[in-house]
Amino acid sequence: MDVVASEQIRALKHRYLRTLDLKRWEEFADTLTADVVASYGSPSGDLPPEFHGREAVAEYMRNALSGNIITVHVATHPEIQVDGDTATGSWLLEDTVMIPDYNRVIRGAAYYHDTYRRENGVWRIATTGYQRIFEAVMGTDALPGFTLTANRWAEPAPH
């Protein structure tokens, strides 16, 4: 077992999710190989089954999560298998998406299945996708007492 490579891949997946949630698109793109293939199908969205290439994936995320949309992605239970300069990984994902403009909260869980490639000593995601366990969409008006008290992406309120 290559413990160093496994830890590097674990850090890579966490960086992928952190840069996604913080909308750091250049850093997000840097977690992906140039020829990455990503599948982000969702029952609540009308998404193409796959995106091909680093720029296509980053552009999709940049557009889909623009404005004041809030996301939190947490990946746990990693199962990483390293074979030289390639690896596979499975992760449990729990995610929350808040869409204030539409008074919606999406909550879900899925299992990610990734492949990784080490190029010039740097691990990147070569393929990524997930299979949903569940996804629930709630209107915030149906949540008694729901108040969004902080949103990093909201326009400042006029004084």
Q: Residue spans of the language-model regions?
A:
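Short, low-complexity N-terminal intrinsically disordered segments enriched in polar/charged residues
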Residues: 1-34
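A structural signal for alpha-helical segments
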Residues: 1-4, 45, 52, 104
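Aromatic-acidic/polar surface patches that form glycan- and anion
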Residues: 5, 9, 21, 50, ...
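Short, intrinsically disordered low-complexity segments
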Residues: 9-17, 53, 117, 123
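A solvent-exposed, acidic/Ser-Thr-rich amphipathic alpha-helical stretch
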Residues: 26-93
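A beta-strand edge to alpha-helix "cap/lid" segment located at domain peripheries
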Residues: 66-159
